Swiss-Prot record:
Gene designation per UniProt: hisE
Catalyzed chemical reaction(s): 1-(5-phospho-beta-D-ribosyl)-ATP + H2O = 1-(5-phospho-beta-D-ribosyl)-5'-AMP + diphosphate + H(+)
Chief location of this protein within or outside the cell: cytoplasm
Keyword Acetylation attributed: no
Gene Ontology MF terms: ATP binding; phosphoribosyl-ATP diphosphatase activity
Protein name as it appears in the record: Phosphoribosyl-ATP pyrophosphatase
Enzyme class: hydrolase
Pathway connected to this protein: Amino-acid biosynthesis; L-histidine biosynthesis; L-histidine from 5-phospho-alpha-D-ribose 1-diphosphate: step 2/9
InterPro entries per record: HisE (IPR008179), PRib-ATP_PPHydrolase-like (IPR021130)
Biological source species: Paenarthrobacter aurescens (strain TC1)
SUPFAM superfamilies: all-alpha NTP pyrophosphatases
EC numbers on record: 3.6.1.31
Length: 87
């Protein structure tokens, strides 16, 4: 099972090595604006799942939002520590 740190390490590796066909690479290439639009979309899906769907569906949507937030962090050059210091 992945956690926040292992996901970030995996995404960082993909950003560095840029494997062909990687969804992460494609999203990074879409830029901050494209990634931001995806974050907003996923946040709305989290809300709708939490409001109207099962706990399992809400958890899945939350995991997708966390993925896109981490891609945004990578695009901005932010580390986990940059974010953790604000928690």
């Amino acid at each position: 099972m992945k956690n926040f740190e292992t996901l970030f390490a995996e995404l960082s590796e993909k950003a560095a090595t840029r494997p062909a066909g990687s969804r992460t690479v494609a999203e990074l290439d879409s830029g901050i604006h494209g990634i931001g639009k995806k974050v907003v979309e996923e946040a709305a899906e989290v809300w709708m799942a939490a409001e109207y769907e099962s706990d399992e569906a809400a958890a899945e949507e939350i995991s997708q939002l966390l993925y896109h937030l981490q891609v945004l962090m990578l695009a901005k050059g932010l580390s986990l520590e940059d974010v953790y210091k604000h928690l």
